[in-house]
Amino acid sequence: MTALYGHDAAVAAFRESFDAGTLHHAWLLSGPQGIGKALFAEKAALRVLAEGQGRVAAPGLDVPDDHPAAKLVAAGSHPDLMRLERLPRESNPAELARSITVDQVRGLSRLFGTTASMSPWRVVIVDSADDLERAAANALLKNLEEPPPHSLFLLVSHAPERLLPTIRSRCRLLRLSPLVPDAMTSALREALPEASDAEIAELVAAAPGSPGRALAFQGLDIAALDKAMGELAREGDPTNARRSALAQSLALKSAQPRYEAFLTRAPSLVAAEARRRSGRALDDALRTWERAQSLAASARGLSLDPESVVFELAGLLASLAPASASR
């Protein structure tokens, strides 16, 4: 299994609870997208299942690849582990369903309706809890309120504040932070062994703290996208020509990965500009950043029209330009 970088404190907190025999039955793993929350959940689940078969002599959450539990988890066939995640659409298997359904959550009865097969533990990974439809969230809550013995729920969430308060209250919150540059470099170097130092450095800069997003940006010519956004922020767009062109180009179905990159990069560029300002100009930039963050989050969560989103976000970038540039 891939190594976990940059989350030593979170690993230590989980291990301390597990080793003391006080492991909480539900953990809410929170933090920005792409920093390794799902990988943490996978490794924590595997470690608990493996330890249930006997002591594992490996540090942190590591389990040797030749361990029986590791082989089963890697094959997706461990009988004591279930994952709740968005499934491929029946109408178009190339796309994922919009949410995790209540029927999927009810399927946990297959896991908890029998005794554990290989260890005392039965583990559920929810990736992500943000994707639960309302009925599914309520069904999961019932399991969290009355957990079966030796059950462990690992809920991944990019926006825990949007979850049902009752779900949050049943979980122990474990915050995972964005990776520092050295950890980012190590994670990307493992994932992209053939990449040059310059390519790794460009990806680190393109998605600070988030190796998952950095990998998604690979091959998208992020430098060109940043150049277009930078020109908007420096020179403005008095005729709307620049943002119209950008919106049309990123709205194409083939441009979906670049659109996703834009949703990440645009608020980051506004934040970078805010850090260079002071006084009233700083206040204005911070308000612009808040609007950009909110719009990008809504675009992801509500599947807003990409062309309209890009046009509006590009307008926020253009509003950062000096007044003289907009004439």
Predicted stretch roles:
Residues M1-R47, E51-L72, P149-S151, H158-P267, ...:
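Charged, glycine-rich active-site and insertion segments that engage polyanionic ligands
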Residues A13-F18, S99-V123, D131, K142:
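Conserved alpha-helical scaffold flanking the Walker A/P-loop in AAA+ ATPase domains
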Residues S30, V126-D127:
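Residues at the beta-strand->loop junction immediately N-terminal to the Walker
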Residues S91-V102, A129, L173:
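Flexible beta-alpha connector loops of hexameric P-loop NTPases
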Residues G113, N138-L152:
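Conserved catalytic/switch belt of AAA+ P-loop NTPases
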Residues S119-V123, P148-L154:
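Loop/turn-to-beta-strand initiation segments
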Residues S128-L132, L144, P160:
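Conserved Walker B
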Residues R134-A135, P165:
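Conserved D-loop-proximal element of ABC-family nucleotide-binding domains
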